């Protein structure tokens, strides 16, 4: 399972990370590493909320999850 994080640097020097498979997931950091860590933390939070509310998950994750009936 992989959810790629795209990292880019803003003109002001800050970094931000985006995960295309999870619309709205974007986090900033002072460094590339901080932006990646903040984005990973946000991904986990978003996935947990989706599971909690019975919402759909990205196709790439569904294959790797066991679903309790």
Where do the language-model regions lie?
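A short, exposed loop/beta-hairpin motif centered on an aromatic-Gly-Thr core
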Residues: 23-33
